[in-house]
Curated annotation (Swiss-Prot):
Bias (Acidic residues): 61-82
PANTHER family hit by this protein: RRP15-LIKE PROTEIN
Biological process according to GO: rRNA processing
Name under which the protein is recorded: RRP15-like protein
Coiled-coil annotated residue ranges, if any: 63-144
Post-translational modification note: Citrullinated by PADI4.
Location of cross-link Glycyl lysine isopeptide (Lys-Gly) (interchain with G-Cter in SUMO2): K108, K179, K208, K238
Regions of compositional bias (Basic residues) in chain numbering: 18-28
Record keywords: Acetylation, Citrullination, Coiled coil, Isopeptide bond, Phosphoprotein, Ubl conjugation
N-acetylalanine: modified positions: A2
Chain positions found as Citrulline: R9
Modified positions (Phosphothreonine) in chain numbering: T104
Domain of life: Eukaryota
Organism: Mus musculus
């Protein structure tokens, strides 16, 4: 019983010290109290500093009153300078605004000096183009000089005559080619199967043979042999030996000179003689 009585007489502080959870709570409470004390000390020190600064401001008040006059005079000078600079800046700004807001056409350059140079170059190019056009016009006029468009309605007879002459010439040419081929074929048959003779014969064939055949065709096409006298046939044989068309002769216009330009050729009759012969008939 005595031991139980002694245990009941133990103080509550000792009981708290014995339990670990209660020890932690006590530590947290002590820390909070210490932090509160530190905050109070800081607040008191800040109040003392503010009081000292107020005392310093009161001592400097007289010096500030003396310097206010100087500050006002400086401010007036600065205001005058600002007004003058503002006037110049506003004029400059107005001029720049006019330049920037000015609308220039697309054909002209924004820089005037370059615009003048471009205009000079354009004028030079225009002059060169005009000169080229003039040269082309002169060339076309020269090419079209003495050119006349044919009128089919008015020149029907002339066109028909030209067509007849063309058809006659083509027919005569093809007949001459056929005749020349026939003559060459006959000569090849006469030569036989020897290659040497054929080669020799083909080497003798030339343009002159074909031209002689063409000249003979020209002479025979003008006059047919049917119903002619032996004298006419003799003349035809002579004409076959000599070319029918004088222009195809090798010696055509070889003996002519400038003195005989107004004289008629030997084969041609004077126009008066032909007219008299026609009248007598």
């Amino acid at each position: 019983m005595a031991a139980a009585v002694q245990d009941s007489r133990v103080s509550p502080g000792e009981i708290l010290k014995r339990s670990p959870k209660k020890k932690k709570k006590m530590k947290m409470v002590a820390k909070a109290a210490a932090s509160k004390l530190e905050d109070e000390v800081k607040d008191s020190s800040d109040g003392e500093g503010s009081c000292d600064s107020e005392m310093d401001h009161s001592d400097d008040g007289a010096a500030e009153a003396d310097s206010e006059d100087n500050v006002e005079s400086c401010e007036e000078d600065n205001e005058d300078a600002a007004e003058s600079s503002a006037g110049t800046n506003s004029g400059w700004a107005d001029a720049m605004a006019k330049i920037l807001n000015k609308k220039t056409p697309k054909s002209k350059a924004t820089i005037l000096t370059k615009n003048k140079e471009l205009e000079k170059e354009k004028e030079k190019l225009k002059q060169e183009r005009l000169e080229k056009r003039k040269q082309l016009d002169k060339k076309r006029e020269w090419e079209m000089l003495c050119r006349v468009k044919p009128d089919v309605v008015k020149d029907k007879e002339a066109e028909r005559n030209l067509q007849r002459i063309a058809t006659r010439g083509v027919v005569q040419l093809f007949n001459a080619v056929q005749k020349h081929q026939r003559n060459v074929g006959e000569k090849v048959k006469e030569a036989g199967g020897s290659v040497r003779k054929r080669a020799k014969l083909m080497s003798t064939v030339s343009k002159k043979d074909f031209i002689s055949v063409l000249r003979g065709m020209d002479g025979t096409s003008r006059n047919s042999p049917a119903g002619k006298s032996p004298k006419a046939r003799q003349t035809e044989v002579k004409s076959e030996e000599s070319p029918g068309w004088k222009i195809l002769r090798d010696d055509f216009m070889m003996g002519a000179s400038m003195k005989d330009w107004d004289k008629e050729s030997e084969g041609e009759e004077p126009a008066g003689g032909r007219a008299e012969a026609a009248a007598s008939r």
